[in-house]
Amino acid sequence: MILTLFAFVLGGVVGSFLNVVIYRLPKKESIVAPPSHCPHCSHRLSALELIPIFSWIFQRGRCRHCGARISARYPLVEALTASLFALAARLQPDFPALLLVWVFMALLIALSFIDIDTYTLPDSLVYAGLALGWMASYLLKYPLAPQASVDSALMSAGLLALVAGYGALLVRRLKDGKREWPVGLHTMHLAGMVGAWSGPAAGLVAGFLNWALNARSKKVFALPDGLTLGLAALAPVAGYMVPGWLQSGLDSLRGLLVATGGLALAGGLYWAFRPEPEEDPNEVVVMGFGDVKLAGMLGAWLGFWPFLVGLMVAVLAGAVLGTAFRSRKVPFGPYLAIGGLVALFFGNRIVSWYLSYLGIG
């Protein structure tokens, strides 16, 4: 009970800080200075005006200095963070795992609200979460074993990158998408195709060699999307249907996902430090690439099979809440975050139950 109460209070304080992150990070402003202030009159907030949840209630949602309305979302973020921290303390009371869970939750909350506001997922938060998941796995063997964390991150990112690739290919009626220099979706499709036929290592090598060739030549060398994605889909089918094939169906599928995800996360990191390519208003986009990178982060923390549970929850939540909020377009990132939180605590149980239901658990 004491831990739960402490977690609630801590969550409120963290939620107050997350409000600063959500407001300032998309504007590329410092989250440290200047101190918290009214967004309308720039009045510096005192300690009494910074008490999570209660300050907003006592001030009736207005600035004490200028009387301007303060969005109800500020206490909402604080209350949500406080509640989730308390829930985590009840479900995962062991240290240091609980500290990592709190950080994971804080990242997802910040990413969700930034995505709602700007339809973007900041690379600084996504890759920080990915790196933290891998570091924790290597140093603490939590939340996953080291190799499992890396594989799951690559496979999860690869899955969503392929969903985006195949979806866009169908919408474009098998026409090629935009070619980006030196690395783009076509590079990931090539890596996935080679990985599906020859293993993940070969796929990664092929993808990075294509990237290097493009960079060296100042040109884009790319196979047709229909060819790379078609052959990538054919390899696992051949592995299942043809005895003694190059790879089993599962190994081929793993090679496809790992190679695609590896190039997706590496390419995303490259573009995080480079000027983003100009957007083509006519380019078909089935899923934002930020969601692909977020999938990698979730996979590093959850494992691939629990990530699939989270993805199913995200799709279901998107269908239900998307209908309820039909008047406003809500990005997929918050739904992935909801699915990730469900999978964090219940993903392995759901997977075990499903395998038992099938009689193979």
What is each model feature region?
Residues 1-361:
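A membrane-topology feature that recognizes alpha-helical transmembrane segments
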